[in-house]
Amino acid sequence: MSLFNNAENPRTLPPLAERMRPNTLAAFLGQQHLVAENRLLAKAIKADRLFSIILWGPPGCGKTTLAKIIASQVDAHFYELSAVSSGVKDVRAAMAKAKANRELGKPSILFIDEIHRFNKAQQDALLQAVENGIITLIGATTENPSFEVISPLLSRCQVLKLTSHSKEDLASILEHALSEDLFLSTQNIQFEDKGRDLLLESVSGDARRLLNALEISTSI
């Protein structure tokens, strides 16, 4: 059943934050120091010269979204692991798939969310595949990678620092959700200026918190 079939029943829809996830750099709001034209990520994607990176920034700033956009723009196989629930076995399984892909001439991206939660042995398991180009690693972390990622792995990655969303970016994200989401756009939802400002200020630059709060407030 499609989103269009489910639009009248929000309980059957994916979470709003997932529905509103952009899939191109052009649609991505914020982090213009990385994604604007002629900036590092935009230039790397345009040149199809992908490199391993650590995305370091606060919650809800777009780390996972950027990783997925990068993978789609360069036409690579995308494997996603959470360091909270994955171990060395999962890493090796992903690398085995990436090695098979490479033999077919297809690149692979391994995205590891909360990479700072991997211990030394788990991070060590990534080294050879990163060094040999079997995988392009994208790690996401809220913690300073200089302290949480082992030096040999860190030296093979470019650290990209992301920032919390500005109030202006959050306002754009809010308006986009209200006007473009298949469900919310049918509800004629309006905010008083004071209520809108309170909502934007309450989420501390976190777009995910904003969309979650919007979803909750419009469902009760």
Residue ranges and their predicted role:
Residues G57, Y79-G87, T141-T142, L162:
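A short hydrophobic beta-strand->loop->alpha-helix junction that borders the nucleotide-binding pocket
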Residues M1-L13, K43-S82, K97-K99, L127-N132:
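Walker A/P-loop
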Residues T12-A36, E80:
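Dynamic helix-loop-helix/coil hinge segments at AAA+ ATPase domain boundaries and subdomain interfaces
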Residues A42-K46, I112, H116-S155:
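Conserved catalytic/switch belt of AAA+ P-loop NTPases
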Residues R156, D169-S185:
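Conserved AAA+ ATPase "sensor/coupling" helix adjacent to the nucleotide-binding pocket
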Residues L34-R39, A76-I109, K120:
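Short glycine-rich substrate-engagement loop in P-loop NTPases that contacts/grips substrate
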